[in-house]
């Protein structure tokens, strides 16, 4: 029996919408990463982008467990000497709650060109509204 490898023409992409309200950040991000990679499909191939599009709404209402709201620190660096910035999860939620989910999912995807291509299929919105009604996204319960 020959190993199956998905071809670009065979891949059918779906759109899913996920409500992040009351969901734990890491658990939500791991499920989203699986869908973006395509691991939920029988045609999954590691070196081919077989994943689907994911729309995340209500990102501002995602839950962090324990004391992470005050203690978790996001680190950014510009590449210049002294160009580092530290921001707590509490400040990140106030400034851009979409980025919390984006960074959590980014860390769970492959590093490199394929991972960046998969990450482009993730759309995150702080509130309950999104501009992707034309794609007729399916509700996904995680």
Swiss-Prot record:
InterPro entries tied to this protein: Ribosomal_uL13, Ribosomal_uL13_bac-type, Ribosomal_uL13_CS, Ribosomal_uL13_sf
What Gene3D superfamilies is this protein classified in?
Answer: Ribosomal protein L13
Q: What does this protein do?
A: This protein is one of the early assembly proteins of the 50S ribosomal subunit, although it is not seen to bind rRNA by itself. It is important during the early stages of 50S assembly.
User: Whom does it interact with, and what assembly results?
Assistant: Part of the 50S ribosomal subunit.
Looking at the UniProt record for this protein, which Gene Ontology cellular component terms does it annotate, in alphabetical order?
cytosolic large ribosomal subunit
Q: Which UniProt keywords apply?
A: Ribonucleoprotein, Ribosomal protein
Q: Which gene encodes it?
A: rplM
Keyword Ribosomal protein assigned to the entry: answer is: yes
Any one Gene Ontology BP term: translation
Question: From which domain of life does this come?
Answer: Bacteria
Belongs to which family?
A: Belongs to the universal ribosomal protein uL13 family.
- HAMAP family linked: Ribosomal_uL13
Molecular functions (GO terms): mRNA binding; structural constituent of ribosome
Would you tell me the protein name for this molecule? Large ribosomal subunit protein uL13
């Amino acid at each position: 029996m020959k190993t199956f490898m998905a071809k670009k023409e065979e891949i059918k992409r779906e759109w899913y919408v996920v409500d992040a309200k009351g969901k734990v950040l890491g658990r939500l991000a791991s499920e989203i990463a699986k869908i973006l990679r395509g691991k939920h499909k029988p045609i999954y191939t590691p070196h081919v982008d077989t994943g689907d599009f994911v729309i995340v709404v209500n990102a501002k209402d995602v839950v962090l467990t324990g004391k992470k709201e005050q203690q978790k620190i996001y680190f950014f660096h510009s590449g210049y000497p002294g160009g580092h910035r530290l921001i707590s999860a509490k400040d990140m939620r106030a400034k851009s709650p979409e980025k919390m989910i984006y960074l959590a999912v980014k860390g769970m995807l492959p590093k490199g060109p394929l991972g960046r291509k998969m990450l482009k299929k993730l759309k995150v919105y702080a509130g309950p509204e999104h501009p992707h009604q034309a794609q007729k996204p399916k509700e996904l319960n995680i």
